[in-house]
């Protein structure tokens, strides 16, 4: 099992942010986490990464029970792309150095870099059409280029789990589509990591995401096969608004109010 969350809750002061969530992710599954802003999606991810601890309940990730594992070493098995990660990076750092730092799950490089590490970083950047960014500093990159570098960084340690927390935020429509197709490519390659993709836009749910978790008000509204979760009746109840969902086999979803 990749992730096993059992009755996890998390409270900030007197406010319940995550409320009694139980959720399992099996090997071979790729999940989309769908919910409106403030629904608790990112908080749940922070618990899965070990950055915050559940007030009650338990979390097991990649076979390790949190509370009995070296989290710094454990995070090397988890690739993470998020706005908060982007804000922690140093703008003067060169793109390839940021990618290399992913091997150590660190901000900056404090370990010995081998020639094979450089070769791997360049190979991953090429896979993501980012090799032309070598030598560029992070603060000179566009938002789309920054996201590609963050994904390359996340892949550097060959993670077993890749978490993409609203990676299309701030992207124009063309950059968004390019990024989504790269995500699809990553998910369908041999020995791909398990993907968790967080969004509140159903048109970002690529065909590779065979499972969907619906989160509302910090609780699980529904979880299961994407075709069952992302359909008109289910999402009308989820959003508390009448909507029509359309899709074709192997294509992305669209939604409209009715």
Model feature map: region roles:
Residues 100, 115-133:
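Conserved ABC ATPase "signature" region
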Residues 49:
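Helix-to-loop junction immediately C-terminal to a conserved catalytic motif
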Residues 212-225:
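H-loop (His-switch) and adjacent beta-strand-loop-beta switch element
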Residues 137-141:
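Conserved ABC ATPase signature
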Residues 57-67, 74:
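Conserved ABC transporter NBD signature motif
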Residues 3, 17-20:
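Conserved structural motif at the start of ABC-family nucleotide-binding domains
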Residues 162-166:
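Catalytic Walker B motif of ABC-type/P-loop ATPase nucleotide-binding domains
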């Amino acid at each position: 099992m990749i992730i096993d969350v059992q009755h996890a809750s998390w409270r900030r002061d007197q406010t319940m942010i995550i409320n009694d969530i139980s959720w399992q992710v099996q090997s071979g599954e790729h999940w989309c986490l769908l919910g409106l802003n403030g629904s608790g999606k990112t908080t749940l991810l922070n618990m899965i990464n070990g950055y915050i601890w559940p007030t009650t309940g338990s979390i097991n990730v990649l076979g390790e029970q949190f509370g009995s594992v070296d989290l710094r070493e454990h995070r090397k098995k988890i690739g993470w792309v998020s706005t908060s990660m982007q804000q922690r990076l140093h703008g003067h750092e060169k793109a390839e150095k940021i990618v290399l730092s992913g091997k150590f799950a660190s901000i900056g490089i404090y370990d010995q870099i081998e020639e094979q590490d450089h070769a791997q970083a360049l190979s991953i950047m090429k896979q993501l059409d980012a090799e032309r960014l070598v030598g560029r500093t992070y603060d000179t990159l566009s938002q789309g280029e920054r996201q590609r570098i963050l994904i390359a960084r996340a892949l550097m340690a060959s993670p077993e789990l890749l978490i993409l927390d609203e990676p299309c935020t701030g992207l124009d429509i063309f950059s968004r589509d390019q990024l989504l197709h790269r995500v699809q490519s990553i998910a369908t390659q041999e020995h791909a990591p398990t993907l968790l993709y967080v969004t509140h836009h159903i048109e970002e749910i690529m065909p590779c995401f065979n499972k969907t978790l619906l989160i509302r008000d910090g609780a699980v509204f529904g979880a299961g096969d994407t075709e069952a979760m992302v359909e008109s009746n289910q999402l009308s109840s989820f959003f508390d608004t009448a909507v029509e969902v359309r899709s074709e086999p192997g294509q992305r979803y669209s939604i409209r109010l009715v």
